[in-house]
Amino acid sequence: MEELYKQLAALARQHGARRLVLFGSRARGDNRYNSDVDLAVYGMPEGNRANFWMDCEDLPTLLNFDIVHITDGMNPVFIENIKKDGVTLYAAED
């Protein structure tokens, strides 16, 4: 999984994300072998999002990706859960 996470981080950087966070069961460590990969993406330009998703889908894995682009006005409880359980895979240097 570590190699997959490195590839996801590289894609996030390539597509202009400010931050990529793994959340959900894989971040908590209570996942099953076939659990999807939940990703929260911060600050990615809208024009890059579809290509990011397609590039993730092209990675050599049978796992499914659930990609959420974080925007203003999202459910604060959802955002708090990401903050509580999330594992940062990539953060842009300021």
What is the role of each PLM region?
Residues 1-19, 27-33, 42-94:
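Catalytic core of pol beta-like nucleotidyltransferases
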